[in-house]
Amino acid sequence: VHWSAEEKQLITGLWGKVNVADCGAEALARLLIVYPWTQRFFSSFGNLSSPTAIIGNPMVRAHGKKVLTSFGEAVKNLDNIKNTFAQLSELHCDKLHVDPENFRLLGDILIIVLAAHFAKEFTPDCQAAWQKLVRVVAHALARKYH
């Protein structure tokens, strides 16, 4: 994947302002609420019976932070995303059996969360760069499935 200097700047510039704990928790909670079938991968998280329960669930919050922290590795390694996510791809494929479509869904949700948090800065150019990034990350995570 080729990244222009502008794309790299738009991604890293915004990432430096992201509150990983808050945005990660919100992104995972939204995934579980908007796409309820994804909840089956989180049965050990306890109460996921309503949007309020999901948003207030400390395990959702903690895992959301973990997911977005991991996503930050893509930002740091834009030129080597495939290798950066090789082990996570293996884990999600072989052990967790996560449908790779869920990676794309979470990427789309992350775009919505970033747009909500950074409305003015999240210009169409910024969105295009981030959309490209979430697609590349989703593809890297799905790599083991192919």
Swiss-Prot record:
Coiled coil: none annotated. The keyword Magnesium does not apply. Disulfide bonds: none annotated. Heterotetramer of two alpha chains and two beta chains. PANTHER family: HEMOGLOBIN FAMILY MEMBER (PTHR11442), HEMOGLOBIN SUBUNIT EPSILON (PTHR11442:SF7). Heme b binds at residues 63, 92. Involved in oxygen transport from the lung to the various peripheral tissues. This is Hemoglobin subunit beta. Residues 2-146 form the Globin domain. CDD domains: Hb-beta-like. Pfam families: Globin. Keywords: Heme, Iron, Metal-binding, Oxygen transport, Transport. GO terms for biological process: hydrogen peroxide catabolic process. InterPro entries: Globin, Globin-like_sf, Globin/Proto, Hemoglobin_b, Hemoglobin_oxygen_transport. One of its GO terms (cellular component) is hemoglobin complex. Red blood cells. One of its GO terms (molecular function) is heme binding. Belongs to the globin family. The gene is HBB. It comes from the Eukaryota.
